[in-house]
Design a protein with these regions (language model features):
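Covalent nucleotidyltransferase core used to form phosphodiester bonds in nucleic acids
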Residues: 21-29
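Charged interaction scaffolds used for protein-protein
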Residues: 1-12, 31-52, 60, 72-109
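Short linear motifs in exposed loops
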Residues: 16-18
Length: 109
């Protein structure tokens, strides 16, 4: 199990990854987290090197993964992604995503 706090908009947000996360993700979103993470990592690498933005689908995957990991760390957070995201100002996906990918050992530092 990996626990880590990531700063988002000046607030330390706990995240947790463990063998339970894929089950939580599948139950909530009816999707395979490993396929989504692989797609997200590929998209992140390509977009970053090309200086381009993420597509909406990629952003949704990022939000879903971040939410599930945050919920796994603290199940008192809001019950919807929208409510959870509303507590933050705008933030850069490029600052948060690498830390989440590293937590799942999808990307290497």
């Amino acid at each position: 199990m990996i626990k880590r706090e990531i700063e988002i908009c000046g607030k330390m947000v706990p995240f947790r990854s463990s063998a339970t996360v894929p089950r939580l993700y599948r139950a909530k979103f009816k999707r395979d987290i490993f396929k989504d993470l692989s797609k997200l990592e590929s998209s992140y690498t390509g977009k970053k090197s090309e200086g381009r933005e993420f597509q909406i689908e990629d952003l949704e995957i990022f939000e879903n993964v971040a939410y599930i990991m945050a919920y796994h760390a603290d199940n008192t957070i809001p019950s919807t992604i929208e409510e959870w995201l509303d507590q933050f100002e705008m933030f850069s996906i490029y600052e948060v995503l690498p830390q989440i990918l590293i937590s799942f050992n999808v990307a290497h530092p």
